Every structure is written in structure tokens, then in C-alpha cells.
Amino acid sequence: MGLFDERVAYKPFEYPEYYTEGWLKQAQAFWLHTEISMQSDIKDWNEKLDDKEKHLVGNILLGFAQTECAVSDYWTQKVVGWFPKHEIQQMAMMFGSQETIHAVAYSYLNETLKLEDYEAFLHEPATAERFDNLVAYDGNNPIGIAKSLAVFSAFAEGVSLYSAFAVLYSFQLRNLLKGIGQQMKWSVRDESLHSKMGCKLFRDMCNENGQLLNLCREDIIKAAETMIKLETKYIDKMFEAGDIEGISANDLKHFIKKRTNEKLVELGYVDLGSYFAYDAKAAGNLDWFYHLTGGVTHTDFFATRPTDYSKAGEGEDFEDIW
């Protein structure tokens, strides 16, 4: 039986890794915004951040709160509807549920910092629509499903907004905004898991249909190019008032290109690992992002580390690190 063949019995699982590496790891990684103390963040916001930094952080956070619902719907409606296997469906439902936790948590940050006077940084509408069209497949054709799943998993979950995650997390380098930093750490780990397992699901589809990888290639490359354009414009928007201490727009652009290459390889296009030319030194200036969020360069977190990070007292003392 294949991925699209219904199995009435709950077990035995035919694809057990979607339970062990997907559902179980996400369940073990459960967290809530109520675990995050924001007292020091409020003090930092009122006393230590300048107006340019407040503009940047406030607009990023407002934008985040508007993006999570669509991601949740993709997992709980599209993926659950396409794949009848229990182990895949329950993983997708768990992922979708976790995205609602993100939405609530971002809203909590916005309310705590009183960000109602800021305008959300969002992806440029025309380019975003082109990308959304590549994800918005609703039919039952395996080629359409594969394209949509690949683009969503690799780029929507694995690249989109990572520049914003890095900007917010960069304040940890200065021992500021620890509550926001803790939430970014947990959010990045969740997104890394979602992207990793979605890419695996695409590869498994390709393993069962030898033509899929090649049939999807052109549209996936097109989506990668569109994502680079989206993130580049988004970075320009974030840094319209100039760079901030600890991070630069130029480094972020190369970081995103490198990450997009890595996701193309993770989908199975091993020959596209250098598709987008990037400055290795500039991209390497963001290696601290992988270190502080618990991952390692070239490898998403869940591939290499345990997942017991849901405890409220887990936070590091960044003065000790830096």
C-alpha cells in the first residue's frame, strides 16, 4: 500500500517515522505563552531600546500574528485531506495545533508590549500572491499535491520569515528581550520540525513515483526564486532605517539564500545545493542563530538534538554565553 491508499486499522503503521519523528517529537515539545516571562522585556522596551529598534521589533511582531492561521489550515485541512494514513494525519493535526499556539503567543507579545500603534511588516502583496498560488493546490492529482507540499514545507515553513526570526533573536547577543528570544527559540524549533517532516513526505512521494521529482522541479525552482525575492524585499523593508547593532541586511540576504539552497537539497534536488550564489562569509555571520536556537549549521534542530525544551525554567543566562 502507498501513501494515498486508505488503511482502516490504526496500526501497524506503514510509515512509523511520521509518528516517532513527527507527532511524538512535536508532542514532547509542547509549550505555551504562559511559560514565558515578559517582565524584563517590558523593562528593556521602555528603557533600553531606541526608537529605530522599537519600530523594527514592533512591526515584525505585528506581522507574525497575521501569518500563522493560514499555516495551521494547510496542515489540518490540506495535508489531512490528501493523506489517509493515521500516522501522517495525526502528525499534521499536531503541527496545525502548534501553529495556533504560535498565533496566540505572538498576540500575547503584542499585547504585553502594547504594539497597537505600529504597522505590521508583511511580505510585498504582488510577490506574496505569486508564491501563494504555487501552494494553493486543492485537487487530487499527485503532481499538484507534491508541488504544493514541497513549496509549503521547504519555503513557507523552512525559509519564510527566518530573517525576521534572526532579527528578533539578535537582541539576545546584547542580553535584551529575553522573553521574545525564548519564544523565537521555541518557534524556530517547531518550524524546523514541520519543514523537515514535510520535506520527508515529499521525498517519500517521489520514492513511490519515480517521475515526480523531475515533474515538480521547474515549479519548485520558480517558488524558490519567488521566496528569495519575497525575503529580500522584506529585509529591505525591515532595515529601511538602516542596520541595527549585531545584524545587517546584507548578511541576512546571504543567510536566506544559503538556507534556500539547503532546503532544495532536502527536497531531493541534490544538484541544486549551490543554485543561489551567496557570500559564505556574510551568511556565516549568522551562524550564531543556529547556535542560540539549539541547532547547528546545515542541520535543522530535530535532526540532531533532544526535544525536552518545553519547561518554563529552561532559559539560558546569555551573560554567561556572551
Residue ranges and their predicted role:
Residues 1-322:
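Non-heme di-metal
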